[in-house]
UniProtKB/Swiss-Prot annotation:
InterPro entries in alphabetical order: PRDM2, PRDM2_PR-SET, SET_dom, SET_dom_sf, Zinc_finger, Znf_C2H2_sf, Znf_C2H2_type
Organism from which the protein derives: Homo sapiens (Human)
GO process terms (BP): determination of adult lifespan; methylation; negative regulation of transcription by RNA polymerase II; positive regulation of transcription by RNA polymerase II; regulation of DNA-templated transcription; regulation of transcription by RNA polymerase II
Top-level EC class as recorded in UniProt: transferase
Protein name as annotated: PR domain zinc finger protein 2
Gene: PRDM2
Length: 1718
């Protein structure tokens, strides 16, 4: 465009005269001010740094013939194959866009832009970096400038490669086009504008005269030749030469057209294929037109081929900008330019179109045709316009028929609808071979595609209006304008074809026809207005127009290389929602999102978002200006520092476009907030398939938690972290922006991604494995770093994994959050801390989960990418420490990723090991830069800050993080985590420095998460600042703790937290109860972990904070102690909060505490912190652990912090005694609360006798606390839900609902089906204490009781898995686990009470089965579990009768380990101990156990082996389950089975027999044969045989028709709830184990009976176990049937299973009735 042409504008231009659409279209980097070069003109000035290579455009204007151009200053001449040289004239500001104001450079020194033609659209590309305050000056250097020449050449080469394939088709299509002129007419109109783009060669040739005058360079002369040359090449050389011309120059039309042309190439082929049947003629026409257009575009494409990337990059902005100007300019441009295009430039057209001899010019428009036929065909357009009287309501285009008009209007509508989807197109284009040139077009069109319809329509309207002079049809009568499909970027010659294609191919499934049409009409209307307003403006596509209308359309200068943006999009980094465009580190607008197809992912709100984005983007992106990655990283850090301000700022921004400021962080946070607030604007938070997968994975991991989490994710992610994940997690971008550390969705998603490296792959291809590198990369590539997901995943995938689970829980608890409460078992506070993370049902839990997160980080990370994380070593260490726990955690608590990490990280530092361990181990891998941070960060606030910055930086920008935080703030829990994050920094300062390091290492992930956001935004910045503000590291922790610890609400009020922390805290505090702040603190404490597993990290951090700042929370004064505790928690090492001495176990610590007994007489039994003042301890216990009144068992004087635990205890241990309890008011201390045991006893005697366990305080803690915790867990896990509120914390404790641990505590609901722990937990397990709770058994630290419960379940369930049946993926009993999956759902929940007491091992089997089936636990874990379980079972076998007795009445006295004589209150504890932790236990029992498992379920070893083969695994699992259920009698029976291998061959057959049993017992033998053949595994056969044996006995014992009927009915119901059934079976089996053992033995001796008899017997046992026995038996039968089904051929099995069930149910019920009676 010859802007500086000698012809000055008639009058001096003023800003007041600048059309609104121009201002709207201004990119945020530039502003209009009077030019310094030409005083009479307005100039474009950079307000922000503009990187070299950035493109602006396309240049918008009217297409005119050279003769029509009055002022060369504002025009570019472009060669169109059909029309020859046409001028894109923007002399009329209303017809142009802001590029018209870019003045001509007077010298090469001044020049910073050069024109680039892409698809006949002129773009301005930055020739060199432009600093703020510089005026953008463009000049066409032609090929003189090597850089420009190279850029143009690249464009050309790209265009050529693109053209090659489509051209061949074009020739074919042209012939067809001639045949279909009617369609072509529309195409012509549409193409009329498009060709303009094509001709938009920056040739000054047409302008030459004036330009030459104005710019005495030879460019004018040179340009025509070049253009001609280019024309021959299909890409005007000049434009090609200007390839570097940046976005400022290109016109939207040109750009869109370029996209259209390229798209046409692709689209034509596809379109033809897709729509050939329906639209063959039209398509042919269109294709011909498109082909011509493509050919035309091809030339530019050559030039633009290179640009496409840039386009992708810039397209969003460009498109956004274009739309407005384009819409205005397109119509006029179309009409005017069309004539120009018509100007027959007898230049050989690369396409070979005959331009040279346009013998037949159109009298209505300037199009000329080489053939009369072409002209006639073309005339249809005008005729329809004249006759018709059906005008498009959007663009006014006239049609001869209502049908045609409606078809045309649908395009507009589709354009409106597709706007969001269009974002995907660019990426698709990029992916396509056309990626370069076409991509450029696509990118431009991505927004324009949506706009495209309008734009095209506008063009059509323009054509119709200007029909007389503007229906540009190719010689053949083909319309040159290309109409790219928004969805697939296919290019069509006509809007009609494009719309038809869209409707048929893309929209059909999306919208009912009626709706589509209606919706389309409605949507396009606004564009129609625009179109009308800018009818004459030449715009390549209406869609950009629409978008432009919707919002500021400023060319999006996505980072210089589009590929990065695409990568974001492809990697899922770009959030695909309104915020996504902003989210992009690159300043992507909705248009850009469209470009990347993000809009589709996000929502069709792109337009609005665009405006918001613009506004938001400007502030946020200002921080992260054009630097797509690096800048963002820095910005993130900056934001982090300024997080408090950024938070508010971003908050507002986040509302409009939370993701804009800090893509990664903002997205996650905003999504998280979305749940609460942040994403309010993002009504449609898109949950990417990855996120969904993540959520699903989480669901698998935490069935209970996922529902809430998913809701949170979907909602918050739409709603929460998961919500944030929706947008952010959906893609890298999405995740970055949407998932704050606190946001469960994001975090879980991240975590999930982290877990399955592949899930991350999309977002973080090497997310897990390369987390460290990514973190490191974060610094390198801010965008990626910024991508919250990347960071989260990268930084703390394990934590994130845990966070995912935890976050899910948190999401559901934090966001659904006020009721989810997990049993708070004060018993093992410290351990819980470590374990809590895995649980991290809520952010509060997260706080407790601090340690757990570490462990989980290591565990999960180890699982996910053992290769790259020391975390794995941690995991190993954790496993070593508590193989059972670790395994259980993995199996039951994938969410507990950080549980063991703390232990592993002891090396990092006493504090570091606990939370930092995972962080450091994991950060090192995850956090390139952050990896080092963990220890250092923790050690020093600066380090923490760096970590946090790293976290935030990875999250995109701390600024965005704050926004995320802010959104998170709206969702109280997420904010809390951020606050916690703030708290974390101080803890890092404290001995827990490693924890902050984890924050930093995990922080990137946390950033995505609310925590991360908080950390990055407020907490982290605060971390640095706050740490400073804090009097001392401990004080900071204390303040944080005070803020977080004092209670979630305190969080908000915590002054200690930095302003950002407090502001965040306040927001979060106000929105969420006190527990969330704890989680916030936790998140602060372990930002890194939070980043990785936002909530879990939060939990982790909370835990750290709680450990470290537990007292501070309760009593800031003990912040130092807290810190010690925190260190303790963070490290597997237990730290004395008085002297900070680390200890490997709670026992050691407990022994050590006696040293401080004098000075510190009081001790927290949960977190083992010492207190000088009883009131402090009481406050601490109450605030952190939720311990209010103490309940003492009247029988054994055991004290319980929670009545539900006491009741469970009494049920378990004193079933035959009339139990009452004493209740001591809150503040009453238990014997465990005294540092000096003797003193404790004495003082406690006042209230009541001290627990016998008190002699060994450590043991007591372990047993008593564990017992209580176990009791709680049992209550939760057992179907026996206490009728009371059974809030673990107390009846009157109402804490923010913490999601239940990953595994679910099950209680029976009225249906008799185990209710998920979530349900139970939600109501009964409030967990507000974010105290550093340690597992008394393994010393693992947990931040909250829910985490502790999770850990205990993991720790204790390792051996008592049967008892708790907390599975890796807790499947709600309601969600019956399908036997074929081998997942014995936590069926034992219903039977948990009994099994728990006497046969927790059985649950282990079921858990193992579920784990195996889920394949989540590795074979090793399963094997270990099985071995442990087997060991426990062996023990049980030894004491089978004892167990039976215990079931009936658990021995009040402790159970003694046969190996080491250690006493245990619960048989479950003993079993766990014997199975996993007994140091003296011989190896043989495990072997026996294995054999037993083989015999019983054959799943322990068989399942493990079968794990490789799902079918076999399922079968074996089913067998195992069957064995467990039918043969869950003590090991003795299992042994009997193994001893009776003859029956082993019958297992499969037994299954079938079982199925057929209803038919006849005799069938059994038959089925056994086939079954045996199928399930050759002797174990199965043995199982079945045993089961059958049982059944006969059961049958002999009794047959109750009622039970059978009940069973059959239940079976049907349970068939639906196979999982629940399996669980029930497992539990029943466990309960029945002892009885069955005897019965089974008898049955065995009696001889194997039909499967039905065995099943019946098993059912009888279960029924005897409880009234639900019949239902359970049904479940059991059902499970068995399911197993059989899985074993048997899938088709027959189900049917047989049902029949079998029906028959078997009655029989079994009959048998069971007697059994139960027995």
């Amino acid at each position: 465009m010859n802007q500086n042409t000698t012809e000055p504008v008639a009058a001096t231009e003023t800003l007041a005269e600048v059309p609104e659409h121009v201002l709207r279209g201004l990119p945020e980097e530039v502003r209009l001010f009077p030019s310094a070069v030409d005083k009479t003109r307005i100039g474009v000035w950079a307000t922000k740094p503009i990187l070299k290579g950035k493109k602006f455009g396309p240049f918008v204007g009217d297409k005119k013939k050279r003769s029509q151009v009055k002022n060369n200053v504002y025009m570019w001449e472009v060669y169109y194959p059909n029309l020859g040289w046409m001028c894109i004239d923007a002399t009329d500001p209303e017809k142009g866009n802001w590029l018209r104001y870019v003045n001509w450079a007077c010298s090469g020194e001044e020049q910073n832009l050069f024109p680039l033609e892409i698809n006949r659209a002129i773009y301005y590309k930055t020739l060199k970096p432009i600093a703020p305050g510089e005026e953008l000056l463009v000049w066409y250097n032609g090929e003189d400038n090597p850089e420009i020449a190279a850029a143009i050449e690249e464009e050309r080469a790209s265009a050529r490669s693109k053209r090659s394939s489509p051209k061949s088709r074009k020739g074919k299509k042209k012939s067809q086009e001639n045949k279909n002129k009617g369609n072509k007419i529309q195409d012509i109109q549409l193409k009329t504008s498009e060709p303009d783009f094509t001709s938009a060669n920056m040739r000054d040739s047409a302008e030459g005269p004036k330009e030459d005058e104005e710019k005495p360079s030879a460019s004018a002369l040179e340009q025509p030749a070049t253009l001609q040359e280019v024309a021959s090449q299909e890409v005007p050389p000049e434009l090609a030469t200007p390839a570097p011309a940046w976005e400022p120059q290109p016109e939207p039309d040109e750009r869109l057209e370029a996209a259209a042309c390229e798209v046409n190439d692709l689209g034509e082929e596809e379109e033809e294929e897709e729509e050939e049947d329906e639209e063959e003629e039209e398509d042919d026409d269109d294709d011909e037109l498109e082909d011509e257009g493509e050919e035309e575009a091809s030339m530019p494409n050559e030039n633009s081929v290179k640009e496409p990337e840039i386009r992708c990059d810039e397209k969003p902005e460009d498109l956004l900008e274009e739309p407005k100007t384009t819409s205005e300019e397109t119509l006029e441009d179309c009409s005017e330019v069309t004539p120009a295009m018509q100007i027959p430039r007898t230049k050989e057209e690369a396409n070979g179109d005959v331009f040279e001899t346009f013998m037949f010019p159109c009298q209505h428009c300037e199009r000329k045709f080489t053939t009369k036929q072409g002209l006639e065909r073309h005339m249809h357009i005008h005729i329809s316009t004249v006759n018709h009287a059906f005008k498009c309501k959007y663009c006014g285009k006239a049609f001869g028929t209502q049908i045609n008009r409606r078809r045309h209007e649908r395009r507009h509508e589709a354009g409106l609808k597709r706007k969001p989807s269009q974002t995907l197109q660019p990426s698709e284009d990029l992916a396509d071979g056309k990626a370069s040139g076409e991509n450029v077009a696509s990118k431009d069109d991505s927004s324009p595609p949506s706009l495209g319809p309008d734009c095209l329509i506008m063009n059509s309207e323009k054509a119709s209006q200007d029909t007389i002079n503007s229906s540009v049809v190719e010689e053949n009568g083909e319309v040159k304008e290309l109409h790219p499909c928004k969805y697939c970027k296919k290019v069509f010659g006509t809007h009609t074809n494009m719309r038809r294609h869209q409707r048929r191919v893309h929209e059909r499934h999306l919208i009912p026809k009626g709706v589509r049409r209606k919706g389309g009409l409605e949507e396009p209307q606004p564009p129609a207005e625009q179109a009308q307003a800018t009818q004459n403006v030449y715009v390549p596509s209406t869609e950009p127009e629409e978008e432009g209308e919707a919002d500021d359309v400023y060319i999006m200068d996505i980072s210089s290389n589009i590929s990065e943006n695409l990568n974001y999009y492809i990697d899922g980094k770009i959030q695909t929602n309104n915020n996504t465009s902003n989210c992009d580190v690159i300043e992507m607008e909705s248009a850009s999102a469209d470009l990347y197809g993000i809009n589709c992912l996000l929502t069709p709100v792109t337009v609005e978002i665009t405006q918001n984005i613009k506004t938001t983007q400007v502030p946020v992106t200002e921080d992260l200006p054009k630097e797509p990655l690096g800048s963002t990283n820095s910005e993130a850090k900056k934001r982090r520092t300024a997080s408090p301000p950024a938070l508010p700022k971003i908050k507002a921004e986040t509302d409009s476009d939370p993701m804009v400021p800090s893509c990664s962080l903002s997205l996650p946070l905003s999504i998280s907030t979305t749940e609460a607030v942040s994403f309010h604007k993002e009504k449609s938070v898109y949950l990417s398939s990855k996120l969904k997968q993540l959520l699903q994975t989480q669901d698998k991991l935490t069935p209970a938690g996922i529902s809430a989490t998913e809701i949170a994710k979907l909602g918050p992610v739409c709603v929460s972290a998961p919500a944030s994940m929706l947008p952010v997690t959906s893609s890298r971008f999405k995740r970055r922006t949407s998932s704050p550390p606190s946001s469960p969705q994001h975090s879980p998603a991240l975590r999930d991604f982290g877990k399955p490296s592949d899930g991350k792959a999309a977002w973080t291809d090497a997310g897990l494995t390369s987390k460290k590198s990514k973190l490191e990369s974060h610094s390198d590539s801010p965008a990626w770093s910024l991508s919250g997901r990347d960071e989260r995943e990268t930084v703390s995938p394990p934590c994130f994994d845990e966070y995912k689970m935890s976050k899910e829980w948190t999401a559901s608890s934090a966001f659904s959050s006020v009721c989810n409460q997990q049993p708070l078992d004060l018993s093992s506070g410290v351990k819980q801390k470590a374990e809590g993370t895995g649980k991290t049902p809520v952010q509060w839990e997260s706080v407790l989960d601090l340690s757990v997160h570490k462990k989980h980080c290591s565990d999960s990370e180890g699982k996910e990418f053992k290769e790259s994380h020391s975390v794995q070593p941690t995991c190993s260490a954790v496993k070593k420490r508590k193989p059972t726990t670790c395994m259980l955690q993995k199996v039951l608590l994938n969410e507990y990723n950080g549980i063991d990490l703390p232990v592993e990280n002891p090396a990092d530092g006493t504090r570091s090991p606990s939370p930092c361990k995972s962080l450091e181990a994991q950060p090192d891998p995850d956090l390139g830069p952050g990896s080092g941070f963990p220890a250092p960060t923790v050690e020093s606030t600066p380090d923490v800050c760096p970590s946090s910055p790293a976290l935030q930086t990875p999250s995109l920008s701390s600024g965005q993080l704050p926004p995320l935080l802010i959104p998170t703030d709206p969702s109280s829990p997420p904010p809390c985590p951020p606050v916690l994050t703030v708290a974390t920094p101080p803890p890092p300062l404290l001995p827990t420095v490693p924890l902050p390091a984890p924050s930093s290492s995990a922080s990137p992930h946390p950033c995505p998460s609310p925590l991360s956001n908080a950390t990055a935004q407020s907490p982290l910045p605060i971390l640095s600042p706050t740490v400073s503000p804090s009097p001392s590291p401990i004080p900071p922790v204390e303040p944080l703790m005070s803020a977080a610890s004092p209670g979630p609400p305190t969080l908000s009020s915590s002054s200690s937290s930095s302003s950002s922390s407090s502001s965040f805290s306040s927001s979060s505090s106000s929105s969420s109860p006190s527990p969330p702040p704890l989680s916030a603190i936790s998140s602060v404490v372990s930002s890194g972990d939070n980043l990785e597993a936002s909530l879990p990290m939060i939990s982790f951090k909370q835990e750290e904070l709680e450990n470290e700042g537990l007292k501070p929370r309760e009593e800031p004064q003990s912040a130092a102690e807290q810190d010690v505790v925190v260190q303790e928690t963070f490290n597997k090492n237990f730290v004395c909060n008085v002297c900070e001495s680390p200890f490997l176990s709670i026992k050691d610590l407990t022994k050590h505490l006696s040293i401080h007994a004098e000075e510190w007489p009081f001790k927290c039994e949960f977190c083992v912190q010492l207190f000088k003042d009883k009131t402090d301890l009481s406050e601490h216990r109450f605030l952190l652990h939720g311990v209010g009144n103490i309940f003492v068992c009247s029988v054994c004087k055991k004290e319980f912090a929670f009545l539900c635990n006491l009741q469970q205890h009494q049920r378990d241990l004193h079933p035959d005694k009339v139990c009452t309890h004493h209740e001591f008011e809150s503040g009453t201390l238990r014997p465990q609360n005294f540092t000096d045991p003797s003193k404790a006893h004495v003082e406690h005697m006042q209230s009541l006798p001290e627990d016998p366990l008190e002699t060994s305080k450590e043991e007591e803690e372990l047993n008593d606390s564990s017992e209580e915790l176990y009791t709680t867990i049992k209550i939760m896990a057992s179907g026996i839900k206490t009728k009371d509120p059974d809030v673990r914390l107390g009846l009157n404790q109402h804490y923010p609902s913490f999601k239940p641990p990953p595994f679910q505590y099950h209680h029976r609901n009225p249906m008799g089906i185990g209710v998920t722990a979530t349900n139970f937990t939600t109501h009964n397990i409030p967990q507000t204490f974010t105290t550093a709770i340690r597992c008394t058994k393994c010393g693992k630290g947990v931040d909250n009781m829910p985490e502790l419960h999770k850990h205990i379940l993991a720790c204790a369930s390792a051996s008592d898995k049967k008892r708790y049946t907390p599975k890796k993926n807790p499947v709600p009993l309601k969600q019956t686990v399908q036997p074929k999956n081998g997942v014995v759902v936590l069926d034992n929940s219903g039977k948990n009470a009994f099994r728990r007491m006497g046969q927790p091992k059985r649950l282990n089997f079921s858990v193992e089965l579920s784990k195996m089936s889920s394949n989540k636990l590795k074979l090793n874990a399963l094997k270990k579990k099985n071995q442990l379980v087997q060991k426990a079972i062996l023990q049980k076998n030894k004491s089978a009768k004892q167990k039976a007795d215990l079931k009936n009445a658990c021995e009040s006295s402790s159970h003694i380990c046969p190996y080491c004589n250690r006493e245990f209150t619960y048989i479950g504890s003993l079993n766990k101990h014997a199975a996993f932790s007994c140091p003296k236990k011989p190896l043989s029992p495990p072997k026996k156990k294995v054999s037993h498992s083989s015999k019983k379920g054959g799943h322990s070893s068989p399942a493990s082996s079968d794990k490789n083969s799902n079918s076999n695994h399922r079968r074996r699992t089913a067998d195992a389950e069957i064995k467990m259920q039918s043969m869950q009698t003590p090991l003795g029976k299992t042994r009997a089975r193994s001893s009776g291998p003859t029956q082993v061959p019958l297992p499969s057959s037994s299954f079938r027999s079982k199925q057929n049993v209803k038919f006849a017992a005799s069938v059994k033998s038959k089925k056994p044969s086939s079954s045996s053949l199928r399930n050759s595994s002797p174990i199965r056969m043995a199982k079945i045989t045993h089961v059958e044996g049982k059944k006969p006995k059961a049958v002999a014992k009794n047959h109750s028709a009622q039970l059978s009927s009940k069973t059959s009915r239940s079976l049907h119901v349970r068939v639906q709830k196979s999982k629940a059934v399996l669980q029930s079976k497992s539990t029943l089996a466990s309960k029945k184990r002892t009885d069955r053992f005897n019965i089974k033995s008898r049955e065995r001796s009696g001889g194997p009976v039909t499967r039905s008899l065995q099943l019946a017997a098993a059912a009888d046992l279960s029924e005897n176990k409880r009234e639900d026995g019949s239902a359970k038996q049904e479940l059991k039968d059902f499970s068995y049937s399911l197993r059989l089904a899985s074993r048997c051929s899938p088709p027959a099995a189900p049917y047989i299973t049902r029949q079998y069930r029906k028959v078997k149910a009655p029989a079994a019920a009959q048998f069971q009735g007697p059994f139960f009676k027995e």
